[in-house]
Regions:
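Conserved small-residue
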Residues: 1-275
């Protein structure tokens, strides 16, 4: 049974435009009211950027499959569910037409200054994939069984204490952080909301040294976070809607056909048994 669903629970810290105060909101609330928030306002900017990329992944996935009205593009075949599963991708011959339609979608949503309801419909259809704690699909994680089955016998994955995940503390087991904002056992105490934010941050910035080591003959390789590898830059708008939409790239500006027509494959749509 899953616990702490990120679609429903309040875990993303935002800065309100009207009051200038911060509050925690759920994924669904954020997309429904993005224009009411000034910006993401987590513990630090590197965390905000990591979470921003998850939000952009949702928007890119949805609006490369359907337009601003929630209708599938005529060059792509989707299943009949709100999951918007791609059954047949865009043929390269229609790349120009598809790109033009993506441009129209971007303009339509920008002018409306709000995200269409199809975003939340899509997320709700994948509700079971957004549990932070779950036996089958823990968000941004793999299950213990999924990991152990791929490791050499007797080997385990790296263990992380809360004080290591929380980069406001960043304390290892053999070196104490003297000036940490909390002390003693409190260093490893985290709420589910904090855990969700720092987990996404860790996955974005982690290097290979802290990853589980796979056997040499395995197909899996140690991987580092994209943000650790390439860094990043983004445009900031007057509110969170503008920031999100200005950074949503529905097609490649350099006429990269492969980028434009290849279906997005976010981690929450992944089926562990098919890896």
């Amino acid at each position: 049974m899953g616990r702490y669903n990120l679609l429903d629970e309040k875990w993303i810290t935002v800065l309100r435009k009207d009051s200038g105060e911060t509050e925690n909101v759920s994924l669904l609330t954020l997309f429904e009211h993005a224009g009411e928030y000034r910006a993401l306002a987590g513990e630090m900017e590197v965390q905000n950027f990591a979470i921003l990329r998850v939000l952009l992944a949702v928007l890119t996935t949805v609006f490369t499959r359907v337009d601003a009205t929630g209708e599938a593009y005529e060059w792509i075949e989707l299943d009949d569910s709100d999951k918007l599963i791609v059954e047949e991708a865009v043929d390269e011959a229609y790349e120009d037409d598809f790109t033009e339609a993506l441009e129209d979608t971007w303009k339509d949503i920008w002018e409306s200054h709000c995200f269409p309801s199809v975003v939340c419909q899509y997320l709700k259809a994948w509700h079971d994939r957004f549990y932070l704690l779950d036996d089958k699909y823990p968000f941004f994680q793999v299950t213990k069984k999924d990991l152990v089955d791929r490791l050499p016998k007797g080997k385990n994955g790296t263990q992380f204490a809360g004080k290591q995940l929380n980069r406001m503390i960043s304390e290892s087991n053999n070196k104490e952080a003297i000036f940490a904002p909390v002390a003693g056992q409190g260093k490893s105490h985290m709420t589910e909301a904090e855990l969700a934010r720092w987990l996404i941050t860790m996955q974005g910035y982690i290097g290979t040294a802290d990853k589980a080591k796979f056997p040499k003959e395995s197909k899996e390789k140690d991987s580092k976070g994209w943000l650790y590898d390439i860094g990043g830059i983004y445009m900031a708008g007057e509110d969170l809607f503008e920031t999100l939409w200005m950074n949503t790239m529905l097609y490649h500006i350099e006429d990269d056909v492969r980028y434009t027509i290849t279906p997005q494959s976010p981690c929450w749509e992944d089926i562990p048994s098919e890896r």
